[in-house]
Amino acid sequence: MWFRQLALFRLPPDARPDLAKLEAGMEQHCFAPPSGLEWSSQGFVAPAGHAPDRLLHPLAGGALATLKREDKVLPAAVIRDVLESKVADIEAREARPVGRKEKRELKEQVTDDLLPRAFTKTGRTRALLDVQAGWILVDAAGQKAEALVSALREALPPFPARLPHTQLSPGSAMTGWLAGEVPDGFELDCDCELKSPGDDGATVRCSKQDLTAPEVRQHLDTGKVVTRLGLVWQERIRFVLTEQLELKRLQFLDVLEEQASQAGDDAPALFDATATLMLGELRHLVADLIAALGGETEA
C-alpha cells in the first residue's frame, strides 16, 4: 500500500477537479484486456479490493486512483522461427525463393496469428489526488507517471496538471544543502550522487556513507554538483531527491506503520487508515520540500 516513489504534478488553484465528475469520466475509461490484434491496453481499475465499484477511493481531502496496463509479450525469436518455417515450406513446395516484400507480408501474417495467444505483462500505477493541497502524487516516474496523468486528462478534459517549477532548482539546492545546512525538518541520510558539469562529466555515487565526511565534501570543491541526495523528513519518511524533483526509494518509517496498524486487523479499515495517513504525511512533506526549494514559480 505504501508508495515507493513519487512524481509530483501541480493542480492550479482555480482548476481543482470535481472528484464526482472525474470518477464519472473515469468510468468511460475502465480497463479492458487488449483484444486479439491489440498489443496493449490501459484503463482505470478500483484501487481498493473492498470497494470494487469505486474507481476513485475517497480520502480526507482527496482520493486514490489506479491505472492498469497490460502488454502482450511476443518475443522476436518466436516470430522469426515461425516465419523461417513458413518461408522454407513455401520454397520447398513451390521451388522458388521468397522475396523481401513477401517475407515482410508473411511476417505481418505470423504476428497477427500469434498475437491473440501471446503472454501478457500487467502493471499498475497508483496516484493520490490531493485536491485540498492541489497535487497529483504518482507512485511512479517518467513515462508511467505521465501516462496516468494523461489518462486522467482524457477522463475529465482539460485537467491542467503540470510539472512544478521552483525558485531553486533541485540540483543547486541539494548542492547547497550538502555543502552547508539542510533546511529545517530535513536531515541528510547516507546516499548521494554527484556529477561534474557537462555531458561527459564524471559521476560519483556515495552509498551508506556519512555525507558530512571530508571525502564527500571534497567532491564539491572540485566543482561537482549534487544530482541525487538522500534525506530524512521529520524522522518519519526517508527518500532520495533527484534533480528532476522526483522522490525515489520512498520509505515510511516505523512510527508511521505503527500508527496505521492501530486500525486493527480488519483489512478494509487498515487499507483506509494507511491511505489516509499516507496522503496526510505526503501533503506536509511536499509542502516543506517546495518551501525548502524557495517556493513555486509559474514556469
From Swiss-Prot:
Its main location: cytoplasm. GO terms for molecular function: double-stranded DNA binding. GO terms for cellular component: bacterial nucleoid; cytoplasm. The keyword Kinase does not apply. Pfam families: RdgC. GO terms for biological process: DNA recombination; regulation of DNA recombination. Keywords: Cytoplasm, DNA recombination. It is found in: Cytoplasm, Nucleoid. May be involved in recombination. PANTHER family: RECOMBINATION-ASSOCIATED PROTEIN RDGC (PTHR38103:SF1). Belongs to the RdgC family. This is Recombination-associated protein RdgC. It comes from Laribacter hongkongensis (strain HLHK9).
